[in-house]
Amino acid sequence: YVELPVDLSEVLFIASANSMQDIPGPLLDRMEIIEVSSYTENEKEHIAKEHLIEKQMKANGIKAKQLTISDKAIEDIILSYTRESGVRGLERCLGDICRKTARMILQDGKKNVKVTEKNLEHFLGTKKYDYEMANAKNEIGIVRGLAWTSVGGDTLSIEVNVMPGKGKFELTGHLGDVMKESAMAAISYIRSVSDKFNIDKEFFEKNDIHIHIPEGAVPKDGPSAGVTMATAMLSAITGIPVRADVAMTGEITLRGRVLPIGGLREKSIAAKVAGIHTVIVPEK
């Protein structure tokens, strides 16, 4: 902008982004992509205990013996007050705790403050996120899927209801075009193998099928929920319950093949946090 010539031939430009989906195609095509995985909950906990807590205590003038934060409190902060791939939000929460502790020491004469999972809301307020745990019992038409987002792995319940009707197929839950097409592929596959599961040939003409993925305000997209939707539909149609401690992920084809998926590490960690004991993934 100062209209001076600059030789950029030897310059290495390094750019970062939270999601590649927001980068324009022509720009992305000229870049060498290096993907960095999000931190796990365990890694975040270690970063907090070894670096962030000490940093925030020093910034707020708190001595080592004046503040103690339990391991369970740190875990609750990570799961219930932040939803991120890094630790910026976690550091902000720890900063809020340190500032409130400093005020308690100065105004209330407290000599030391202990933060636990029981009094955490006193420091940070009501929980912002509710981590969905595994269902307590096996249910018909409800299957747990796994998602990979820009902030890490997540689990999502897929619900299917079957009711008398005229063959209507409905999808709700703020689904994107790719996920809708995946659902259509799943229902087509089930119809093609209906004889194998003793499903009446006229069933799909005499009944409506409704697929819903809760948290309708949150946009959802991607093909990897195909096998989950197919399983949920088959469960609802046959009346066979699905194990509550099982989650699955994979794109399904019209021939029933399950294609490879991404983000397996993040998805597996999300399943473990949610209390899922078995994860079904594509063989390849």
Tell where the protein language model's regions lie, with residue ranges.
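Conserved C-terminal "switch" segment of AAA+ ATPases
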Residues: 19-29, 33-95, 100-113, 193-202, ...
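Conserved catalytic-core segments of large NTP-driven translation/proteostasis enzymes
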Residues: 70-162, 166-172
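AAA+/SF3 P-loop NTPase mechanochemical coupling elements
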Residues: 1-17, 67, 207
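Short glycine-/polar-rich loops that comprise or flank the Walker A/P-loop
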Residues: 8-11, 28-32, 243, 275-277
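Substrate-engagement module of ASCE P-loop NTPases
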Residues: 1-9, 38, 235, 273
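Peripheral, non-AAA+ core regions of ATP-driven protein-machinery
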Residues: 133-135, 139-144, 152-284
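Structural signal for conserved beta-strand scaffold positions within catalytic alpha/beta enzyme cores
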Residues: 15, 33-35, 213, 248
